[in-house]
């Protein structure tokens, strides 16, 4: 009997130690990634894109030889600070809900005379599309530290949220994935990477509150639309068109859910 008690006690201790070890391993992995990102953020290359974006905002360009300083991002012509954390939102002049990137292209067309359709067809990282990413990076940086608070006052904003929600949970592609497959509940991860639950506020600087971001793995600046396109690629879906209602609706869904989260964009990612 005494031997049985000793064996049971030893097994209990081993199980407890195993559970503690697993918890410590998970915690240390998450902490290690956080420390890695903190070190990388000291001298984030995104600062170069911020500088380029600010210069593009103030520089006279295009057939109309005009700057973007009168661009209305939702807070009034020329007002940049605070705009990013309210987008996507409805704009009366275009009669549609727009995210930051599609709104910037609207301003580039109306104020500078550039061709919006041509920009939309340009590959990410090239030509005027690279300029859109730089502009978005700078605009996002001007709202760093502010809390997300997307409007749902207009009927079109409400529609886009609901469309985004449906798209988020829609399964498809050869792998039968949805956005929710990775980001629909707490506690999911890929390898050492924790996956945020984007059906609610995932926390300051997480998910929607971190993009645009500099990707260390490929040395590129990624906008939110490019990030969503990459998600579609992983789902084995065709890429959405730039400024499509699909990506803007998903942005609306995640942005509204992120209400109260602090913006840290432009962030730095693996």
PLM region spans:
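Bacterial N-terminal signal peptides that target proteins for export
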Residues: 1-9
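Bacterial N-terminal signal peptides
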Residues: 8-18
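Sec/Tat signal peptide C-region and signal peptidase I cleavage site
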Residues: 19-25
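Electron-transfer interface patches adjacent to heme c in soluble/periplasmic c-type cytochromes
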Residues: 25-48, 58-134, 144-145, 170-270
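Short, charged low-complexity linear segments at domain edges
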Residues: 38-54, 145-165
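Hydrophobic, well-structured mid-protein blocks that either form specific transmembrane helices
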Residues: 135-142, 151-152
């Amino acid at each position: 009997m005494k031997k049985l008690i000793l064996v049971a006690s030893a097994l209990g201790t081993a199980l407890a130690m195993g559970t503690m070890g697993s918890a410590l391993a998970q915690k240390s992995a998450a902490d290690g990634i956080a420390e890695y990102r903190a070190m990388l953020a000291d001298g984030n290359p995104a600062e170069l894109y911020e500088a380029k974006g600010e210069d593009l905002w103030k520089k006279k360009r295009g057939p109309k030889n005009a700057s973007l300083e009168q661009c209305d991002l939702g807070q009034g012509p020329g007002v940049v600070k605070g705009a990013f954390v309210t987008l996507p939102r409805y704009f009366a002049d275009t009669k549609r809900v727009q995210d930051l990137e599609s709104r910037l292209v609207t301003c580039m067309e109306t104020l500078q005379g550039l061709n919006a359709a041509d920009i939309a067809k340009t590959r990410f990282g090239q030509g005027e599309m690279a300029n859109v990413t730089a502009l978005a990076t700078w605009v996002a940086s001007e709202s760093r530290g502010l809390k997300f608070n997307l409007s749902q006052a207009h009927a079109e904003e409400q529609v886009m949220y609901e469309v985004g929600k449906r798209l988020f949970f829609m399964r498809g592609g050869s792998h039968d994935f949805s956005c929710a497959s990775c980001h629909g509940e707490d506690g999911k991860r890929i390898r050492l990477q924790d996956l945020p639950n984007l059906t609610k506020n995932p926390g300051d600087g997480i998910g929607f509150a971190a993009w645009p971001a500099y990707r260390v793995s490929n040395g590129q600046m990624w906008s939110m639309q490019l990030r969503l396109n990459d998600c579609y690629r992983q789902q084995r879906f065709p890429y959405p068109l730039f400024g499509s209602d699909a990506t803007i609706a998903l942005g609306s869904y995640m942005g509204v859910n992120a209400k109260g989260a602090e913006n840290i964009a432009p962030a730095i990612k693996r």
